[in-house]
Amino acid sequence: MKILLARIPEEGSHYEGSDPGAIMQIEADPQIEEFGEVEYVLYAQRVSGELVVRGSLTSEVQMRCARCSEFFSTTVTVSDFLRAYPAPEGTDSVEITEDLREEILLHVPGFAVCSAECRGMCPSCGADLNKGSCKCRRSEGPDTWSVLDGLNL
């Protein structure tokens, strides 16, 4: 998104719209399938030779669940976007797309789960436990922590 400085009045200017999800430039990421449109509500104002932009950003993202490995949709919201850009006299425009992209990526959850009730996958056979139980025989071995019960501290 490019902000044309000549079009910003002294009191500032309001921008609302969306950019295609392609601005996120996500390629070959095993955890993220795709981003939807990046929607923005921004306010830009020139202050002392700078362009100050603040507002909010939202995007839908298709992500892989960290527990069951299925893709699901979640919303990434940035409610406190704030950046100041140098805008000396003679500058025609300021490009802010890279900062919008960066802010959305910083708000993508690192350990995303499709739901709080997700049971994940069986660690032995990899079966999706949300779809049913697996046929693995769980070995009931000795409790490895029971040794600590015998410590006298």
In which residue ranges do the predicted regions lie?
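Structured interface patches
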Residues: 1-153
